[in-house]
């Protein structure tokens, strides 16, 4: 007679479920607070003035911002290229890394489920070039590492040189923010020192090779360059009136990016915008709202549409090829 054996959940399984539940709760809380703050902030906005600011924005500044956005997305492609070199897949050409990067990032961030969508898109592209699911998991981990190293370094720099900028967001004094900046930069430097000689993490069955020190340094440079280009795009779109420096914009921009990422809302919508307006909106907010609208069009909406179309064309072409072969 067969009996059904009931296996009790392990302690690690229960703690994992608790952490997952806590993460969901934090994401919902961030999104709810941000949407409330954004709604409250936008009540006093004169929409006619916002569109007037957009209409009077110099075409050359829009072109410069677009160039900086393109530069940011080009630098993103090196996230994947570095990850491929780290796992020893030097045979994968740059064009494949660029395709995987450019399709996965805008689509995943546009949908909001980055940790779910990005690996699926990367696998669809890399599996046709001989990479396994484990290889793709390694690439996702390493590109995420580049993202966090770049963000934390740039945030540390921005906080150190403009500690007051983020005080409206984290409610900490300028002095505390400067110490936080030092802690962030020391943490990144410590990780760089720890990785200077090749290391593996994970298990014997599933080892994950960390990049060596020089590659980690390159990851940091690429990550900061990517974020710096994006922050500069926002900077040039803000009219001269608010008189906001590049370091405050960098600090608030990265804080807004990280909070938007943590909220899992599509393109950080609501969260990114509220953080940006609260962090920089001491005066008239109409110029900032105008800059936000133009930036979102350039950095989020158009790349999302283009990446979605490109991925659809690639998948359609491959499907057509399979039909011909059969």
What do the PLM-derived regions correspond to, one by one?
Residues 50, 79-83, 98-103, 118-122, ...:
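Generic hydrophobic, aliphatic-rich segments that mediate packing or membrane embedding
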Residues 74-80, 112-122, 229, 247, ...:
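Transmembrane helix boundary and interhelical junction motifs in multipass membrane proteins
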Residues 1-102, 151, 160-261, 283-326:
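Predominantly cytoplasmic-facing regulatory/coupling regions of multi-pass membrane proteins
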Residues 94-128, 260-263:
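Hydrophobic alpha-helical transmembrane segments of multi-pass membrane transport proteins
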Residues 105-114, 144-156:
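Mid-bilayer segments of alpha-helical transmembrane spans in multi-pass integral membrane proteins
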Residues 95-99, 114-117, 128-144, 284-295:
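Membrane-interface alpha-helices at helix entry/exit sites of multi-pass transporters
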Residues 85-87, 123-130, 279-281:
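Helix-loop junctions at the membrane interface of multi-pass solute transporters
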Residues 125, 137-140, 145, 152-156, ...:
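Hydrophobic alpha-helical membrane segments of integral membrane proteins
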């Amino acid at each position: 007679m067969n009996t059904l054996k009931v296996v009790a959940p392990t302690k690690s399984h229960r703690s994992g479920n608790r952490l997952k539940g806590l993460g969901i709760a934090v994401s919902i809380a961030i999104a709810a607070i941000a949407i409330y703050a954004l709604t409250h902030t936008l009540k006093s906005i004169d929409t006619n003035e916002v569109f007037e600011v957009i209409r009077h924005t110099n075409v050359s500044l829009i072109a410069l911002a677009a160039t900086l956005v393109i530069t940011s997305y080009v630098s993103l492609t090196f996230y994947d290229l570095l990850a491929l070199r780290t796992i020893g897949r030097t045979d994968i050409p740059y064009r494949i890394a660029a395709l995987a990067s450019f399709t996965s990032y805008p689509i995943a961030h546009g949908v909001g489920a980055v940790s779910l969508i990005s690996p699926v898109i990367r696998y669809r592209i890399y599996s046709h070039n001989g990479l396994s699911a484990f290889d793709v998991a390694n690439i996702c981990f390493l590109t995420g590492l580049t993202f966090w190293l770049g963000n934390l370094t740039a945030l540390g720099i921005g906080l150190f040189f403009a500690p007051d900028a983020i005080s409206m967001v984290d409610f900490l004094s300028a002095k505390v923010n400067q110490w936080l900046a030092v802690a962030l930069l020391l943490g990144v430097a410590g990780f760089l020192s720890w990785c200077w000689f090749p290391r593996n993490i994970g298990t014997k069955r599933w080892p994950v090779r960390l990049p060596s020190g020089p590659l980690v340094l390159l990851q940091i440079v690429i990550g900061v360059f990517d974020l710096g280009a994006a922050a500069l795009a926002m900077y040039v779109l803000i009219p001269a009136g608010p008189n906001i420096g590049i370091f405050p914009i960098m600090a608030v921009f990265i804080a807004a990016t990280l909070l938007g990422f943590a909220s899992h809302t599509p393109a950080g919508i609501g969260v990114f915008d509220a953080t940006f307006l609260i962090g920089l909106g001491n005066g008239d907010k109409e110029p900032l709202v105008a800059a936000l609208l133009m930036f979102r069009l350039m950095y989020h909406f158009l790349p999302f549409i283009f990446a979605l179309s490109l991925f659809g064309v690639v998948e359609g072409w491959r499907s057509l090829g399979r039909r011909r072969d059969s």
